[in-house]
Amino acid sequence: MIEVTLLGTGSPVPDARRAGPSTLVRAGGHAFLVDCGRGVQLRMAAAGIAANGLSALLLTHLHSDHIADLGDLLITRWVTTFTDQVPLQIIGPPGTAETVTAMLAAFGRDIGYRIAHHPDLTAPPPVEVHEVTEGVAWDHDGVTVRVAPTDHRPVAPTIGFRVEHADASVVLAGDTVPCATLDALAAGAGALVHTAIRKDLVELAPQQRVREVCEYHSSVEEAAETAERAGVGILVLTHYLPPIAPGQEADWRARAATAFPRQIELGDDLHRVEVHPGVCVKPAG
């Protein structure tokens, strides 16, 4: 079984009820944080996972809302680890290493203060960055993480992840429009976690910059169509824009159900979904 927790279901627009985009995936004794949006560590604490309990950080792309708390995560993991400092594995698209280096540099004075003050902190936060666009990015203890390109242009490159364990599988799409590479990555998966925006509402915004968001994100219906093409068993919607207003969950769900007739999950931060083997309707390949 793979457990998915929607830590942050929000967007770049601050929302008192929703943290920034971030999802926790637990599989085979490992914990993966997918993206680290605004407020993620508060939601991690509520979900019972500490920064030093993560096996790896998976970044779908380098938009600010998906990496807003990267620096906080790196520093917190470092100062709350009281055993050997094992490097945090960070898997992301090309550009990730530069971003991580710049983030640590931004905290350079803080890191220096702490090393000077605490004798057991002798080096900056240890990280190992793996830049990938496709293929197997992680394979340990029966847990495999596969990567494939997505389409969030002009943001490029962007990637999605597929986590597999004991015949269960979950795909995390990140921000993307429908594309063949995501269809292939999601084929036969137990669940697809997908960003969803209400284009019918966003297109009404008076500001062109807001309307342009529709150009490189999937609508609720498009996310559902991707899930149906892939034959997944469960569609998990997240990263809602605009935020789902209280009482409007049924409307969002109904829009997805026009294209996807099976289990549809959406909700507030900390919504949890269990993905068991055998829930897909179309075997991979």
UniProtKB/Swiss-Prot annotation:
SUPFAM superfamilies according to UniProt: Metallo-hydrolase/oxidoreductase
Co-factor: note: Binds 2 Zn(2+) ions.
Superkingdom of the organism of origin: Bacteria
Keywords: Endonuclease, Hydrolase, Metal-binding, Nuclease, tRNA processing, Zinc
Enzyme type, top EC level: hydrolase
Positions that bind Zn(2+) 2: 65-66, 175, 239
Cofactor(s) the record lists: Zn(2+)
Ligand binding (Zn(2+) 1): 61, 63, 152, 175
GO-annotated molecular function: 3'-tRNA processing endoribonuclease activity; metal ion binding
EC number: 3.1.26.11
InterPro entries with a match to the protein in the record: AtsA-like_MBL-fold, Metallo-B-lactamas, RibonucZ/Hydroxyglut_hydro, RNase_Z/BN
Residues at the active site: 65
Catalyzed reaction equations: Endonucleolytic cleavage of RNA, removing extra 3' nucleotides from tRNA precursor, generating 3' termini of tRNAs. A 3'-hydroxy group is left at the tRNA terminus and a 5'-phosphoryl group is left at the trailer molecule
Family designation: Belongs to the RNase Z family.
UniProt xrefs under HAMAP family: RNase_Z_BN
PANTHER family assigned to the protein according to its UniProt record, in alphabetical order: ZINC PHOSPHODIESTERASE ELAC PROTEIN 1
Subunit relationships: Homodimer.
Physiological role: Zinc phosphodiesterase, which displays some tRNA 3'-processing endonuclease activity. Probably involved in tRNA maturation, by removing a 3'-trailer from precursor tRNA.
UniProt protein name: Ribonuclease Z
UniProt source species: Mycobacterium sp. (strain KMS)
